[in-house]
A protein has these predicted regions:
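Donor/substrate-binding cores of folate-linked one-carbon enzymes
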Residues: 24, 86, 90-204
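Short, well-structured alpha-helical segments in soluble
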Residues: 73-82
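N-terminal Rossmann-like dinucleotide-binding module
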Residues: 1-45
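Short, structured coil segments at secondary-structure junctions
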Residues: 53-54, 104
């Protein structure tokens, strides 16, 4: 029996990826304990579900602080009080400083709605369409000081269909996000994936030269 890994999740919005994590825990597929959900937005809809389940929810509104430095100092102190082994950014829409990210080096994951390194940043789906890409997807990666630049762990590929707009493409990509984020967290909790001293990903004891890719039908890569 693996001792549940203590986790803190950061969100800014609906929290659908958080819900996917909660569902995986309920299905005994994820050996973690969510100790707290923290949002930088008091109106984040994603705070409602964990609160109903008795998970601690905390709002640290970035708009209430004079600078990013002060905001992050409060955020870091709050997170560290829960002694997490992993910090998950599940739709957390704030750029974090190098100092903050370095504090959690090797134990902070993010989900991004593109096949990184392509299309980091915002407005991903429209940019994919504007570029005429035939494929998009989602990536779980370790967080480093470079925005969306940390080494990828796991990806899911999503075809771009005729007639797609940004909303339709985003919907299908989000379905895959809900699959790969809990899986990558499970790998981390089981000790299968780590960030090495040189900034590379180690998977099952060997360097991961390229991200694992979810198989058709949502099957875990062999």
């Amino acid at each position: 029996m693996i001792k549940p890994l203590p986790v803190v999740v950061l969100i800014s919005g609906r929290g659908s990826n958080l819900q996917a994590i909660i569902n995986a825990i309920a299905d005994d597929e994820l050996p973690i304990e969510i100790r707290a959900v923290v949002s930088n937005r008091p109106d984040a809809a994603g705070l409602q579900r964990p609160a109903l389940l008795g998970i601690r929810t905390i709002v640290i509104d970035h708009a209430c602080y004079a600078s990013r430095h002060v905001f992050e100092a409060v955020l870091q102190t709050t997170i560290d009080a829960f002694e997490p082994g992993l910090l998950v950014l599940a739709g957390f829409m704030r750029i974090l400083s190098a100092e903050f990210v370095t504090h959690y080096r090797g134990r902070i994951l993010n989900i991004h709605p593109s096949l990184l390194p392509e299309f980091p940043g915002l407005n991903t789906h429209q940019r994919v369409l504007d570029a005429g890409k035939r494929e998009s997807g989602a990536t779980v990666h370790f967080v480093t000081p470079e925005m969306d630049g940390g080494p990828p762990i796991l990806q899911a590929r999503v075809p771009v269909l005729a007639g797609d707009d940004a909303v339709l493409l985003a919907r299908r990509v989000l379905e895959q996000e809900h699959r790969i984020l809990p899986l990558a967290i499970r790998w981390f909790a089981e000790g299968r994936v780590q960030l090495d001293a040189a900034g590379g990903v180690i998977f099952d004891g060997a360097p991961l030269e390229r991200p694992r890719v979810l198989l058709p039908g949502g099957r875990e890569p062999a």
